[in-house]
């Protein structure tokens, strides 16, 4: 019996990376899926799910537009009879400007996708779950950049800090409903979003340096984040609520320069 047998799940940002890995993982554990992405790659993910024997509906959507988020919830109810899990995973790196040179419009776009998007998922998926009266699980993709400074550009970091607090606020506002809300905080992960970083490292032949600030000394793979999202979505995490779970190889366990300052660079 799979961890999500008999459950219906929505996943956004499912065209690649963590979203695609999660779609495959959730389906393998028995979930019926409604997946969304801004690109046509969502249909490629759907084919992979179907080829593996899963049930899936794929929609091209903008996760920061309310009508699009509502359409995912409607598709879950119309095609599968309800909704048990929502994984608001879509995001963008957004504006790269510093404090003195950022573009307000670009900041607004980053917040629209990265923060308003998850809030819309909480609004619509949460309402559907409350109306059903059988609880549910909402997982939001935040980032270690929302926990500590220095892990991402300003707009991205601010948006992800907002996602973390959104999970806490939503968990409180949904109290007594049986709907849990948690955030997963990836560290450096090899995805479409980080492809420029990995491509640059490969071109410079310095891929061995990626992830060297965390104790595991490597970057994560999307499947490692999918495993955590699956756990938070499943009944195995039934008493975890309003939390931000860092999946970062230990990056946030200490100040990243501590080892170097102490001369403890290896064992």
Where do the PLM segments sit?
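Substrate-binding pocket helix/loop in short-chain dehydrogenase/reductase
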Residues: 97-99, 103-108, 210
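Short C-terminal tail/terminal secondary-structure segment
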Residues: 96, 230, 241-267
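C-terminal helical subdomain
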Residues: 183, 202-236, 240, 247-249
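Active-site helix of classical SDR
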Residues: 122, 159, 167
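Residue(s) in the substrate-gating loop at a strand-loop-helix junction
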Residues: 143
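Alpha-helical segment proximal to the catalytic Tyr-Lys
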Residues: 127, 131, 172-176, 238
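Conserved glycine-rich cofactor-binding loop
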Residues: 8, 15-16
